[in-house]
Amino acid sequence: CHFIYSETFIQGMETSKQKTLKGSFSLYGKGLHTGLNLTVTFNPAPENTGYKIQRIDMEGEPIIDAIADNVTDTQRGTVLERKGVRVGTVEHGMAALYAMGVDNCLIQVNGPEFPILDGSAVMYVEKIKEVGLVDQNAPKDFYIIRKKIEITDDNGSNITILPDEEFSITAMCSFNSKFISSQFATLDDIHKFSDEIAPARTFVFVRDIMPLLQANLIKGGDL
């Protein structure tokens, strides 16, 4: 896969305020990999909290920061782990929070992963719209891209980040399949996420099902 991400300093950024949810909401469903019945609850959080995930099923209800440094696995889902606290399949929820403009949120889950729901981010987006957002007093922090950044992993996946006058993400992906050709898509406005990206659903090739089951994954993948 190859991703190209571009962003620059937007006029007015320096006066933007952090935002959190106006209220809490919960979503229920099976975990994609564990098959467990799970509940995840998104709550308002104070300024400068960021995204924090609390395992309320564990002793002491420990909290893990949803940051890149805590990503330990990306096989069929994003896993965060630190000091024995582990939570997986967070990617749809995290994407929805960011795209909808939520800066601070405490997320409580009663198991080792978020529920898969319908395999997309739509339900997260709908709930965020339903409860709404509230401005906070602290200014929003921004990363400003001033020069090209490029990262390639051992599998050949590549991310290129470029300065630009507008926000955009372009993704290209090859599935090595005679049934699905290489895919190409562009998101040129983050506000289009709810309509153009959120409905995209997780899928799997038949050829991959047995290896995934043997890896003790997709126990809840009966959508």
Where are these regions (language model features)?
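C-terminal regulatory domains involved in ligand/effector binding and gene-expression control
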Residues: 5-103, 108-223
